C-alpha cells in the first residue's frame, strides 16, 4: 500500500471541511456577539480581553506567546497590548536573560478588571451555553467537544492545547461560586485565618 494513497473521496473531504466552516462561522457570530456584550461595560474589545486572559494565566507572557495562544498576528498582539498599557492594565518589561523578547504582565488594575469581568459573567446571556443546556439536561453534563479539541490540537500543536487546558484548570482552582457569581478564591492562609476566627467565636 502506498503512503500517499487516499482513504477518502474529494467529495467527502469537501463536505466535511465545509460543514465545519459553516458551523464555525455560525457559532462564531453568536460567540462574538455575546463576548462583546459581556466586555463592553469595561471598555475592552475581544482582542484586549483575550490578551488580559492569557497574561493572567501565564503570569507574564512574551508578545510572541500572546500572539500564538491568542491566535493573532504578532503586530496585533503588540498593538493591543500597548493600548492596554495606556489604560494601565498591563506593564511591559524585558528579562535580564532575554533582551530580545518583550514580556507583559497584568497590573493590579488589570487583574481587578479581569476579576470584575469574571464576577459579571451571566450564563443566561450566553447563546452557546443556552444552546448546550438541553444536552446537559439530557446527559447530565455539557458536551466535551473532544473531536473538536483533537482537530485544534492537530492544527495548533500540543503547546497550544496545554495552555488551553491550563487556563481552565486555573479557573477551577482560582475561583469559587459565591452568591451566583464567580469570585477569586482567597489565599489559603487568609481562608484558614477566617476558619480559625469563626471556630473561636
Curated annotation (Swiss-Prot):
Stretches that traverse the bilayer: none
UniProt GO molecular function: DNA binding; DNA-binding transcription factor activity
GO biological process, one term: response to stress
Start-end of DNA-binding region: 63-86
One Pfam family linked to the record: MarR
PROSITE patterns attached to this UniProt entry: HTH_MARR_1, HTH_MARR_2
Sequence segments annotated as region (Disordered): 182-201
Protein's UniProt keywords contain Transcription regulation: yes
Record flagged with keyword Transcription regulation: yes
N-terminal signal peptide: none
Domain HTH marR-type stretches: 13-157
SUPFAM superfamilies, per the entry: Winged helix' DNA-binding domain
Keywords: DNA-binding, Repressor, Sporulation, Transcription, Transcription regulation
Gene3D superfamilies from the UniProt entry: Winged helix-like DNA-binding domain superfamily/Winged helix DNA-binding domain (1.10.10.10)
NCBIfam families, A to Z: PRK13777.1
Purpose of the protein: Negative regulator of protease production and sporulation.
Summary of subunit composition and partner proteins: Homodimer.
Protein name per its UniProtKB record: HTH-type transcriptional regulator Hpr
Species in which this protein is naturally found: Geobacillus kaustophilus (strain HTA426)
